[in-house]
A protein has these predicted regions:
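A short, N-terminal "cap"/entry segment at the start of jelly-roll beta-barrel domains
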Residues: 1-34, 129
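N-terminal regulatory/effector-sensing and dimerization cores
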Residues: 30-126
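Amphipathic alpha-helical segments enriched in hydrophobic/aromatic residues interleaved with Lys/Arg
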Residues: 118-140
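Generic detection of long, well-ordered alpha-helical segments
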Residues: 28, 58, 131-135
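Short, structured coil/loop segments at alpha-helix boundaries
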Residues: 17, 113, 134-135
């Protein structure tokens, strides 16, 4: 099976420039919680990422909008289904990918800051979100 980290049809990604991230790190308010990268991967066939500890310099939130995927953290593997999210902590090796038969559609955010660990606490396992009539997710 091929493994792809990006390049999906219809994908969107924004990576903040390094100088802007450095400014945020110095800002009294901005340094508490800031985004470094944000994106959307629709129907991400063969999506796969594996990072060693030294490569993980931010927290990573992944929200599965459709389909299925998985992630590995601390030698445990977790299944992820539609309307679930998880946050991978900084400085921890991990891997994740889409299901071969039913690949996920995901939104993802890399973030950091002095309050990032507080913000992400308890979300290192899949958490479900129940869509509501006024969720507006389909408008995105």
């Amino acid at each position: 099976m091929p493994r792809i980290k990006d390049g999906f049809k219809g994908e969107r990604a924004i990576v903040l420039p390094a100088f802007l991230i450095e400014e945020l790190k110095q800002d009294p308010l901005g340094s508490e919680l800031y985004i470094t990268d944000i994106g959307y991967y629709p129907h991400a066939y063969f999506h796969y990422r594996k990072r060693d500890t030294e490569e993980v310099t931010e927290f990573i939130l992944i929200y599965c909008m459709e389909g299925e995927g998985w992630f590995e953290l601390d030698k445990h593997q977790y299944a992820v289904t539609a309307n679930q999210f998880f946050i991978l902590p900084e400085h921890q090796a991990h891997a994740y990918g889409s299901n071969e038969e039913n690949p996920w559609t995901i939104y993802w955010i890399h973030f950091n800051g002095t309050k990032a660990a507080f913000f992400s606490a308890g979300f290192d396992r899949p958490k479900s979100i129940t869509p509501q009539e006024d969720s507006r997710i389909k408008e995105r």
